UniProtKB/Swiss-Prot annotation:
Entry GO MF terms: antigen binding
Gene: IGLV3-21
UniProt KW rRNA-binding keyword: no
SUPFAM superfamilies: Immunoglobulin (SSF48726)
Disulphide linkage map: 41-106
Matches recorded under Gene3D superfamilies: Immunoglobulins
Compartments reported by the entry: Secreted; Cell membrane
Protein name: Immunoglobulin lambda variable 3-21
A GO-annotated cellular component: plasma membrane
Region: Complementarity-determining-2, residue numbers: 68-70
InterPro entries in the record: Ig-like_dom, Ig-like_dom_sf, Ig-like_fold, Ig_sub, Ig_V-set, IgV_Light_Chain
Function in brief: V region of the variable domain of immunoglobulin light chains that participates in the antigen recognition. Immunoglobulins, also known as antibodies, are membrane-bound or secreted glycoproteins produced by B lymphocytes. In the recognition phase of humoral immunity, the membrane-bound immunoglobulins serve as receptors which, upon binding of a specific antigen, trigger the clonal expansion and differentiation of B lymphocytes into immunoglobulins-secreting plasma cells.
Keywords, alphabetical: Adaptive immunity, Cell membrane, Disulfide bond, Immunity, Immunoglobulin, Immunoglobulin domain, Membrane, Secreted, Signal
Quaternary structure note: Immunoglobulins are composed of two identical heavy chains and two identical light chains; disulfide-linked.
Length: 117
């Protein structure tokens, strides 16, 4: 029987201490096992900012899977990769596995204001 892995993104409204910055993610991304999932994070000129991605499974704390746009922490599989350009940052998960089912959050670090959103 075929099954589908559901990768959920959330609509994020992030507020800094001085200005507001809105990040938009799709409500959900659904792919078949073995295929490639791409989860986007949209924001005005997001390519000029540093983007981090977190994976959160039910009942667990978030886990950092990509930082500074495209770097992976130790222990995160190479199947997880990131890119960031223009108004869109993207988390790509290659060869999706059942264990990848989770919520995925993007976080932006604006170096000009020196605090996260």
């Amino acid at each position: 029987m075929a099954w589908t892995v559901l990768l959920l993104g959330l609509l994020s409204h992030c507020t800094g201490s001085v200005t507001s910055y809105v990040l938009t993610q799709p409500p959900s991304v659904s792919v078949a096992p073995g295929q490639t999932a791409r989860i986007t994070c949209g924001g005005n000129n997001i390519g000029s900012k540093s983007v981090h991605w977190y994976q959160q499974k039910p009942g667990q704390a978030p886990v950092l899977v990509v930082y500074d746009d495209s770097d992976r922490p130790s222990g995160i599989p190479e199947r997880f990769s990131g890119s960031n350009s223009g108004n869109t940052a993207t988390l790509t998960i290659s060869r999706v596995e059942a264990g990848d089912e989770a919520d995925y959050y993007c976080q932006v670090w604006d170096s000009s204001s020196d605090h996260p959103t």
